[in-house]
């Protein structure tokens, strides 16, 4: 378990959504990866996931960040100090695509150790499924394109992480 605010976020998420799987992995990152910027070694947290319309469609975004490489992403991003995983999800989705969410469900937490060989930084990603309160997309300033899909795009970042959740959305199991 992680210390301090990290532990508080984890406890809050489990209290609200029940215990979910925690997937652990290590990823090699280049020395200029944003995770290594700054002096903090505290774990970082992000929230995101599949935002669906209730009819099996999910929304993905493309950002203008060069590091994104033109790939599609789920809406989401880094949490602010003191922000809970679900509050961060709602804020990020509102900022990125202009949509309010209903009934977010936490499906897993991914604990990733990023290393460049010399340094290691830990991050936690709270992965959700949530229903969109509207289907009208209003991309924010960081988003260059937002679109509804009825399948996972081949160039979706972290595509394998979303296979199971997408299947749940498509079959409307529990949602």
Regions found by a protein language model. Give the residues of each.
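Acidic, metal-coordinating catalytic segment for phosphate/diphosphate chemistry
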Residues: 2-48
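Glycine- and small hydrophobic-enriched segments that form the cores of compact globular domains
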Residues: 94, 108-116, 146
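A generic structural micro-feature
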Residues: 41-43, 71, 118-124, 143
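Conserved hydrophobic/aromatic beta-strand scaffold that supports enzyme active sites
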Residues: 50, 60, 127-129, 148
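Active-site-adjacent beta-strand/loop module that shapes the phosphate/pyrophosphate-binding cleft
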Residues: 53-55, 110-136
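Conserved Nudix-box catalytic region and its N-terminal flanking loop in Nudix hydrolases
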Residues: 57-95
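NUDIX/MutT-family hydrolases
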Residues: 127, 138-170
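A short coil-to-beta-strand element that immediately follows conserved catalytic motifs
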Residues: 100-109
């Amino acid at each position: 378990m992680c210390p301090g605010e990290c532990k508080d976020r984890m406890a809050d998420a489990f209290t609200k959504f029940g215990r979910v799987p925690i997937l652990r992995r290590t990823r090699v990152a280049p020395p200029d990866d944003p995770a290594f910027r700054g002096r903090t070694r505290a774990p970082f947290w992000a929230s995101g996931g599949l935002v669906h319309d209730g009819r099996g469609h999910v929304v993905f975004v493309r950002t203008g960040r060069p590091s994104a490489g033109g790939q599609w992403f789920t809406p989401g991003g880094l949490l602010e100090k003191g922000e809970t995983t679900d509050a961060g999800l709602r804020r990020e989705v509102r900022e990125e695509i202009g949509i309010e969410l209903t009934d977010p469900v936490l499906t897993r937490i991914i604990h990733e150790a990023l290393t460049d060989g010399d340094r290691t930084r830990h991050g936690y990603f709270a992965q959700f499924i949530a229903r969109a309160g509207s289907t009208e997309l209003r991309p924010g300033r960081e988003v260059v394109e937002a679109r509804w899909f009825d399948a996972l795009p081949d160039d979706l970042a972290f595509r394998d992480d979303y296979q199971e959740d997408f299947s749940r959305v498509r079959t409307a199991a529990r949602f």
